[in-house]
């Protein structure tokens, strides 16, 4: 693989930007989720007995435990963590000097602090992925203290390879889990049609894509399955550069499709950031630069023969990908009806056997590819000039390789927990090491909690409130379907945690979701912070003047409307069908509600602490007030618009200055080369010749002086 300076820069900038979105999204929701009057007050996690700080950090690594030392309330500590994360990550996006290992270590520690105390609301798959990708960014980013003279080291390709291994695990595990769990929607290839309406937060474009012919949506399901299983196996670790580029663009296309039809989630952004590991610097060079570098190069017949062989192998891989798709999914073109039929040609048992055999093979492919990168980096270190430089490069290589080996070994543990895979390939020592560092979430499992696609429609919990128990009014959140006439919302890259948990809670009853009792309690009490999670606009919330006396929850199944079949829903985007009662009507004195609150620990009384009056506490209050009534999507959109504006100003300024930075006198002095003796002798001969008769007139001298390099300078 060639140089990776540019894709590494893109990866580090992308991770920093994703961190900024994640911290800002959590910050907006802290009062409603974790405040003293929130759904899951974070104060309840504070230790009842005073424990040494070091002991508390060892039990649960989080900066929350520093709150008493800073004179801050638990909620304010979370706000401080988020604000520090936003500032630090934006600094890394805008300033290249801040894209340092120390910066990414701080960002990872800040987000880990949120994750360990965030409960169910912060335990989604993209949170786990952000922690692992963020930790790898610590290894990928340069350590400025050790690289004062150079921003590139020989082991950079090795650390950047770890990003590719993570991207492979994410893509392959997600693709395999669709079929390994026996999901019938993927085996009959109707999954994409149902997925468009059953995903976390469908957009308006998803409604239009859902109207496409059934055969075209089945073909789309084939593309999604083949892109998640076959293409990563054949392209991600291929020694042929064009195959890796093919894998990159396929995954980029899929992620853009998910963003446009299912809102922009952190999972999609992280997948794009990880996909940069398939690129190299040559891909970012312009054609003119490539031609300029190849002008003096002439190919021998042996090089031409090798290039032809590589091209044949590449074409064979493309042909195999196409042939396997046609064979496994029985793709046939019906020229009369102008359609392509598709049907799976394998059973769940056959696929499970395939996964069991391919698992160990993928691990060994990873080991071989990792070994190649490590040996290649070591050879580059050995070729360094100077004994001291060579020794220093080898020391860095040894430390980085040891860390990479440890992370690679740890990643095999969650990778083997995928449905259909075996954990017998994991060594006991590796399992012990994994358990020892599990609380730091250095590696994660992906595809393990695969949610089967609902073929009966999109399940949604609809809250209803009433004053008298006779007239009920719906309380619909901002970022999920409620009123069938409301246009599908745009949320991304904001991550609405409450809507996400309500979507996942449909698989189980309210008894298995302790946070749901806390939600009902706060809505019955009329707490503004929790109401703000549902609607920031008071006019959209029916009980803004007085909280309801009773609240119940119903379970509906939503479907996209069909403009041809649904003649009665011409102005509606959804049609829904009532299924059952999710939660019976309760009030604040209901014994069932109080029992659920007791069981989940939310009924516990904590002493009301007097408001702290420290300068830091007052500053946090001042920062919170202006955005209290703004939606999370608006806050993050404003943040991204600010970053885009700064980059635009930079581009405009660079175009006016010709893209050159002003040079200092010291820089000019350093760049001056000492004159060669031959140049001095030649100059003396020229001067003696000019002193002879036949001198130039004054006008000619003036012209010559204007042409002088010194004059132009």
Give, region by region, the residue ranges found by the protein language model.
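Alpha-helical membrane-anchoring segments
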Residues: 1-713
